[in-house]
Structure formats: structure tokens, C-alpha cells
Amino acid sequence: MVGDARPSGVRAGGCRGAVGSRTSSRALRPPLPPLSSLFVLFLAAPCAWAAGYKTCPKVKPDMLNVHLVPHTHDDVGWLKTVDQYFYGIYNNIQPAGVQYILDSVISSLLANPTRRFIYVEIAFFSRWWRQQTNATQKIVRELVRQGRLEFANGGWVMNDEATTHYGAIIDQMTLGLRFLEETFGSDGRPRVAWHIDPFGHSREQASLFAQMGFDGFFFGRLDYQDKKVRKKTLQMEQVWRASTSLKPPTADLFTSVLPNMYNPPEGLCWDMLCADKPVVEDTRSPEYNAKELVRYFLKLATDQGKLYRTKHTVMTMGSDFQYENANTWFKNLDKLIQLVNAQQRANGIRVNVLYSTPACYLWELNKANLSWSVKKDDFFPYADGPYMFWTGYFSSRPALKRYERLSYNFLQVCNQLEALAGPAANVGPYGSGDSAPLNEAMAVLQHHDAVSGTSRQHVANDYARQLSEGWRPCEVLMSNALAHLSGLKEDFAFCRKLNISICPLTQTAERFQVIVYNPLGRKVDWMVRLPVSKHVYLVKDPGGKIVPSDVVTIPSSDSQELLFSALVPAVGFSIYSVSQMPNQRPQKSWSRDLVIQNEYLRARFDPNTGLLMELENLEQNLLLPVRQAFYWYNASTGNNLSSQASGAYIFRPNQNKPLFVSHWAQTHLVKASLVQEVHQNFSAWCSQVVRLYPRQRHLELEWTVGPIPVGDGWGKEVISRFDTALATRGLFYTDSNGREILERRRNYRPTWKLNQTEPVAGNYYPVNSRIYITDGNMQLTVLTDRSQGGSSLRDGSLELMVHRRLLKDDARGVGEPLNKEGSGLWVRGRHLVLLDKKETAAARHRLQAEMEVLAPQVVLAQGGGARYRLEKAPRTQFSGLRRELPPSVRLLTLARWGPETLLLRLEHQFAVGEDSGRNLSSPVTLDLTNLFSAFTITNLRETTLAANQLLAYASRLQWTTDTGPTPHPSPSRPVSATITLQPMEIRTFLASVQWEEDG
């Protein structure tokens, strides 16, 4: 997508002298001796990374060097589906065929050895690659080796940064970079991150890129006010210090703002989709324009060069789906380069033009040996003009956002079971199981027009289709793995509609089994809820003991749900058996007071309005009056200030004060031994269940919104708002991609003086997992089950946007309003509300947020299945760990990497100074020896975050900052398998393993 209107340290260069031979394609797998006692091998190779710049073109140090970067920006779905874009179908919607782009580019590169091109989207490139002949693949490998075809970024997609979870970002980057490593070796390893189109940039994204080994980061979009200031102060390029916990330069990343977003300069677009005049150098032609073009280009280059600090400037030569006829581009660029450079001798012009790449441009900046300013916040929210804040997409298509988050959860369970069961997961009694389709579908969903909700409706439908089709082979894999690990061949069932209380097996069977798998590194006590048809059931735990259970009636539908608490070990499962008992009349609990409570929390509701009015933490003796209700903003369709309307990208209400969905709610109180609920009905299209389970330290709000009525001609943007008397001084806090927390201040930006044109939309920020407010004593935190937009628009208040339905397009290229066909879309979701003392709040919200993202997975079976192995007794409980992980450590990744290799990531999930009461912010030491029960680790190699290079061989360019020298790590030393995790540190390993014979 193109255009803001979507149309047309240590001293720099510490390793610059090392330009020796490239590392071979086997760099990730150097020969290691067998390990009698397990250890991790660290080798110091501080200059290996600089070798990758040896193919860069020569520059002229005494001139202004203009780096022309030919590129195409190929959205992995937007106006057309992924397949439609790749094959060039429906060009009446948008003329775009990626397969033809790559065909044409390769041909044009071969025609002139000085030409260069960068490619980004590996989802497309890998598909194209598989269709090529061996001869073509050999040619492409040589182009890559010579640096004429270079990959930037290297992820499966160019992911969104506002609505993505860090675990899914890491996964999609790993998928793309692994393809490049296995296909081209280190020759194809990208050196720069390239996010030219995402609509704002998160600090966590920069941190992840730095930990993946990138030398720099280029992007196109930033707030128009921010860009204006940066141009004046020569801060279009700086070092982004992207973590407050990781020691510099671990999360430091050199960052460059491209001068023209990612488009060619005006008048210099020579794609077949453009209308600019080609270069006519024949003086005899009446269309001769070469002299004027050269004059124009020299002025353009000189003016642009004044905005940057070195004798180098970059021009992006390409845009959306360009280069389908690459010759039109390259032929004119060849002429431009020749004509401009001829002026050096003819007229003494001090401008040198060359084909280049972002990495080669970065290399020259590094050699300039300058000191750079440091940025510590992020680039949200993004506005491309007054009244034009791109904060609507934080909440657009909430159903797809939830499906993506559920699929991430499901994929991690699938990956873990594949790792625990080994080859038995892939081939077993249920067929061929495979995690790859869901892994690829999830990677596609991270694209900046997918989970963001900014594609057309039929494309959003196709994204959902890809996820659904990816689940199926994972279900087969999980069935094989569970049979192998449990010793029972059951007819496993996966009820995908449990969120709307539909599961045929539990609603019809007299007896069934419930297998609960826990992907967390510690045991969980988790409430199982299943739709049933009777009122009395007997539930037995894995040891055959009867456990308490309840059947509650859902007032809105008069259906029943069975509840029981399941205790599930770390990275393992428990099997519970359920059987019907003779029916009894359900006992109703009556209470005049609208109060629900357990041993930790009490929630009171206003008897006159039915709204939540008070929350009390009984454990910490905290009482907070809090009112929660639903409101809606009337979506702007344009006014006398601006024609800008609310749309898929843009949030713009036509007034600052939202309207009540209802001032009161009809209520129904449900009290049972295992749950207490207040059912609130606000309107025909908005309801909520406020719920408390025993031993639960948070209040659960399960909301249902939609279909949003628009018969009155008004688009509506629905929020859930919490109002308190907390003195919050204009401050609130949001997560960055589900990881570190950033402080937000109303009507304020840390690096420039804000002219606020939209008091509501201009204060919205992305919320991936949590938002909170605090007065320094008490903290009110709300956890989300998907990405949403959120804010605190007045002191003591906190709001989250849960749904939007709009009647007008926002003129950013989609060309259709965010208005699902038919009656509209109804959406269900959850907010978890925590009230804590500030010093203990992090311990609560960190661990609860982890459980939300990696929730237990329920698998059902009829029971009575045959034994998997006749000689082995079945087991009804299993843990993949011999000992639990400490609470501050998260098992981020456990997945198959090769026939006898696993990918393992361990993460410290607390920030520095975040928790002092339980020392959860302290470093944690783990012994990986015999940690896992299903396999033995025989060899361990530590890698960078995306697992595409050994950490021992990874080296990044070094930069000097205005904050002073940054000490770089000393050469690594061999250490034992006992590893230490610092706060917010993620360590990644490739583990050679041997599976236990009996699983």
C-alpha cells in the first residue's frame, strides 16, 4: 500500500575492515564434538557480520552519493487475496501479479551487472522459488551471492507493529529467515529490517529486530508533525534504544526514516503503472527531456541531502506491486545514472548516483563515524495529517483479531506436542500430522493488512480460511501425539465453537473424557466450561477421584454449561472423565444484593442501574469505587474542519463525548459453588457476564457486542469504559506487543510539541495484552484477549474499543467501509480486571497475561479407546518437564526444527524493577540438563532470536550515541548448560535430542 492517501557505544565501524569470505551455508551447523557433559559453545567472531558488506558498490567520498534502491512492496493480501496477488488474478481490482514481478526482475538484473534489487516478502518469494527450474534457481543464487539481488527484512511478511503479539512476530520472522538461510546460506541473510508500510512503529519491534541481529531499521511512516521536526533538527536517523531492561547495545537499533515514505520522488516513477515521462536523451526528439530531468534530479538530491547528516542519501525507486515490467524501470534508471554522473566531469557537479541497497547505504553511514541521538519511546500513534489519526485499526475486525490470537495459542500447543512426541506426532493412527500449514497461515496473519483488520472483506474471509485449514493438520498431529503420550487411541474431538457454547459430543454423550493440555511451564488450576444437555454430571480426576462440579444455566439461552476445575501439570495434560447422573431439578440461588465474591475479590453492582460500582481486593484490603459501562462514538463522515471520515485505518469520532449504549442494565444473578455471575443486558445488541471463580484474583468480564445497528445512518465505535476516582495525573500505561510497558501521557509526545487536533483519537494507543492506570498506591489493570485500541481520556478513566461498524471509507485505499455484509457481525470477548497495590501488580498481570496467551487447550473423546501399545499401561496425566519453571520464566518456544532437533526459547517475562515483593524481576538461573521428561538434550547451540545464525558468529555494526560510549560484550566463553536469564531476556537454542522410547 502506498502513499499517505494510499494511492499512486563504541566507535563506529569496529569491524569495518573485515571483508573476508562469506560464511558458508552450513554456518548454522558448525561441527561440534559430542558432549559427554552438556554445554553451550560460545566462539568469538566479532567481525563476521561485516563481511556481508563486501559486495556493496563503490562510492565517491568527496561527493553527495545518491543511493537508488529499486524495490517492490508486495502486500501479502489487501485488496486481493494472497493467491490473487501472486497469480495476478482480478487485475480489475488492482493490477498486480507477484510471479511476473519476480520473473521480470531476474531477467532485468541479468541484463546489466550494476543493477540491484531488494525483495522482502518471503511468503511470495518462497512460492515463486518452488516453481522455478534448477537452472533458474542457480542463476538466482548467483545473483544473491553477488549482492545484486538482496533480501531485506526477510520475514514471511512485513508484519504489523500495533496489533501483533511478540511471540507471533518472532515466529513469522523465524519462518522467513529460515527459508533464506536454508536456500542461500549466509549470502541471503538480511542485514537490515525494512518496515516501509506499517502504520506506526512499536518499541518492542525494534528490540526484537536488534536481538535478531539486524544492523539497522528503515521505515516510511511516521507522524507528520514528528517528521517535520526531524527534518529541521537533522534527526531523520538515530539510534533507537528499544528496551529499558536489556543492557545496551542489546536492544539498540540504528533507525532511518525514508525521505519519501517508500515511493519514488515525484516525476521519477517509471513503472508501467505510472504516468511519468520516461527519460528521452535523444536531442533530436521533440520529446527530449534529459537536460531538464538532470537539473530536476540534482536539485532534488541536493535538497534531500540537506535533511540528513552524511554525504549519502537514499531514494526508493519502486512502490506497490511495481516492476511487473522491470525493464521500464531499469532502462530509465540506467539512463538517469549515466546522465547525472556525466555531469561530474562536464560541469564539476558533486553528486554521484548509484544502484544500491538499504544495507549498503547503512554501511556508508556506519563508516561516517558520527555520534547519533537516541530515541527511547515509540512511534505511536501515527497521523498523516490534522484530524487523521491511524488509531482505528487497533480495533478493526475484532473477530479476526481474536481468531489470530486463538490460533497462536493453538499453534504453540501443536508445536509443543510435536516436540514432546517426536516422529510419532507426524505419522500415527490418525494420519499425517503437520504443524507447517498453521505456522505459515499464522505468519501470513501477521501482515500489516491482515491482523490489523485493514483488508477488504473477502480478503479477511480468506485469512480466516487459511487459519481454519491450518488447524486441521495440527488436530491430526495433536491426536497422534496425545495417543502416543497417553497410551490410548481415542476418537479425539476438537470443539472449535466452545466460545458460543456449542460442542456436539458433550451435548449428546452420556459419558466422555476431557483432556486438558497446559502449555505453560508451571501447573495450572483452570476452570473447564462445557456445553451440556443435562443438569447433573459426575466428574473424576486423573486418579479416579470425584471432583466438585456444577451445571449452570445460561439465562440468555436457557442452555447449560458444566463447570469443573482441572489441575494440569506443566507442559502436560490431565484426563478427566465425565458421566451423566440422574436428573435433578436445578437449584436456583436467589439474592437481593447484587454482589459476587470469593476469598480474594468482591464486586458490587448498583441495584438501581445494574452497573458495576465497586471492586474490593480482600487480600490486600483495597477498595475502589469503579463504574463500568458500554458507550459508543458516533463515527465522523467528515465535517467543516476536514473531510476525513472514520474507517478501517482512521478513528475519528464526530464528537469527543461518547454516548451510552444504555444507562442501565437488566441483571440476573447466578450463584453456584464453582462460579458467581452477574448477567447484564444493556440492549438488544450489547450484553455482558461479570464472573468470579473460586481462587481467582481477577474479575472476568465476558462481553458480547453486535450486530451493531446502523439503521439510523450512524456508524458506531463501541467502547467499554471504567471510571474511578484515581488521581492519575494524565498518565496511563500500555504494553508494547505484549511485552514491555510504556508510559503514555494525554495530549503529549515525548520528542516534539504536539498540536492535538483529535482529543480522542489522538490519545488512543495499541493495547495487545494490558492497559492500566495507577495513583501510585492502587493500580487498576485490564487484560485483553486480543489487540484493541485503548486510552485514558480523563484522570481515573480507562477505555478499550471492542467493536466498530462504519458506513464510509476513510480514503486510504481499501475502498469499502468497515461494514460486514448482511446484518453485521457479533463479537464475544473477555476483559480481566485486576486491582492491586502498585508494587505487587506486575506479578499479577504478568502471570495472568501469560495464561491468557497460552491458555490450556481442551480436547474431547468418547472414552473406551484401545491401548496405543499393548505392553504399556495408559496414563491419565503427563508432564513434559521434570521440574516446573520459575514463575518469571516463560517457555516461549518448544518446536520441532529437524528430524532430531528442537527449537527452544526461554524468556524472562519481567522487566527490571517491576516486582520487588517476590523478586520476580531478579535474574533467574536454570539448569537445562534433564529439564524435559520426553527427550534428552544431547547437544545445545545458542542462536540469535530468529535462529538463523549461531550467536557465537553473530556480530552487529557498532554505533556511537550522544549518551556516551556503549560497552560491547566481551568475547564469549564456554559455559555449562546452566543458563541465566536477565530481566526481559530471551535466549534461543537449537537442541539435538533423543526421544524416550515410551514417550
From Swiss-Prot:
Transmembrane segments: none annotated. The active site is at D197. It comes from Bos taurus (Bovine). It catalyses: Hydrolysis of terminal, non-reducing alpha-D-mannose residues in alpha-D-mannosides. The lineage of its organism: Eukaryota, Metazoa, Chordata, Craniata, Vertebrata. One of its GO terms (cellular component) is lysosome. Residues 591-621 form a propeptide. Pfam families: Alpha-mann_mid, Glyco_hydro38C2, Glyco_hydro_38C, Glyco_hydro_38N, Laman-like_dom. Glycans are attached at N134, N369, N499, N634, N640, N681, N755, N919. Gene3D superfamilies: 2.60.40.1360, Glycoside hydrolase 38, N terminal domain, Glycoside hydrolase family 38, central domain, Golgi alpha-mannosidase II, Golgi alpha-mannosidase II, domain 4. GO terms for molecular function: alpha-mannosidase activity; carbohydrate binding; zinc ion binding. Processed into 5 peptides of 35/38 kDa (A), 11/13 kDa (B) and 22 kDa (C), 38 kDa (D) and 13/15 kDa (E). The A, B and C peptides are disulfide-linked into a 67 kDa complex. Keywords: Disease variant, Disulfide bond, Glycoprotein, Glycosidase, Hydrolase, Lysosome, Metal-binding, Signal, Zinc, Zymogen. This is Lysosomal alpha-mannosidase. Changing R221H: In AM; Galloway cattle. Its cofactor is Zn(2+).
